[in-house]
């Protein structure tokens, strides 16, 4: 519980930032977790550690997936069928995620101190989502992880960890991550169990950061990604990411160009 004179800050982007040296790295019992956060400070700076957002976990009822599996005769393995089902959702989400950003973004500005160097924002300029754009909590643009198959997802993610560009798999900050095991490689045996969506800014008007109506809309949007006839390929995913970056930087008071 909070003292009566303290409140939870309702925005994703921080405000009232103190000098960086006054921000302490979280002290945890597990020293690996402490080392991980110290790495993030070195890579991204302390101010970016102050960003927050909603992680939306989504799982299809296993009984429903099993029923779909037995209603088809193309895929021999139940695990492969489940993986392909979740991969289709993930790929189509990356293709069309900009629509949700347009509807639910809520990080139009931040104080100048947040930026290393001069602010890229012009006076009185507002954008849809600083958090989801290149000035938010994102990986280096060269970090590319393939969603073509679960095998390629695992191998490309492990590549970036081995190269040192990521200190751990959890440093991969995609809008959607494949979940269900502590290590990505374990998914090859267990299969994808659920998806983690990381796109969403906090809704500053919602007590818990997201309204129930918004959560339900996102739920139906994710289901739509499964029911679309087509599955986005790498070019489609690339287009979706480019469009996300454009929409994130648009004036939130105007309609999107799309």
Range-by-range predicted roles:
Residues 24, 28-42, 46, 50, ...:
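Loop-rich catalytic cores of soluble enzymes, especially ATP-dependent carboxylate-amine ligases
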Residues 175-182, 187-258:
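Terminal accessory/anchoring regions of large secretory-pathway or extracellular enzymes
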Residues 1, 13-15, 63, 74, ...:
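Extracytoplasmic glycan-interaction modules
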Residues 1-29:
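Active-site acidic/histidine clusters and adjacent loop/turn architecture
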Residues 7-18, 69-74, 234-241:
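Short, glycine/acidic-rich hinge or "gate" loops at secondary-structure transitions
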Residues 19-25, 68, 206-210:
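A short acidic (Asp/Glu
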């Amino acid at each position: 519980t909070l003292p009566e004179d303290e409140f939870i800050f309702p925005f994703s982007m921080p405000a009232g930032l103190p000098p960086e040296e006054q921000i302490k790295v979280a002290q945890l019992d597990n020293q690996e977790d402490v080392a991980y956060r110290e790495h993030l400070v070195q890579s991204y700076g302390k101010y970016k550690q102050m960003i927050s957002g909603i992680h939306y976990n989504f799982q299809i009822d296993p009984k429903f997936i099993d029923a779909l599996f037995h209603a088809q005769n193309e895929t021999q393995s139940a695990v492969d069928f489940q993986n392909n089902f979740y991969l289709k959702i993930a790929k189509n989400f990356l293709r069309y995620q900009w629509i949700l950003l347009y509807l639910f973004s809520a990080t139009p500005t931040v104080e100048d101190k947040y930026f290393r160097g001069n602010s890229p924002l012009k006076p009185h300029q507002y954008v849809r989502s600083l958090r989801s754009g290149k000035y938010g909590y994102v990986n280096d643009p060269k970090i590319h992880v393939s969603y073509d198959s679960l095998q390629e997802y695992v191998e490309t993610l492990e590549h970036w960890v081995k190269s040192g560009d990521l200190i751990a798999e959890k440093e991969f900050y995609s809008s959607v991550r494949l979940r269900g095991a502590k290590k990505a490689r374990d998914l090859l045996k267990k299969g994808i169990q659920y998806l983690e969506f990381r796109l969403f800014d906090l809704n500053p008007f919602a007590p818990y950061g997201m309204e129930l109506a918004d959560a339900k809309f996102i739920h139906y949007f994710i289901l739509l990604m499964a029911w679309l006839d087509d599955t986005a390929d790498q070019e489609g995913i690339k287009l979706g990411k480019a469009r996300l970056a454009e929409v994130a930087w648009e004036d939130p008071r105007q309609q999107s160009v799309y």
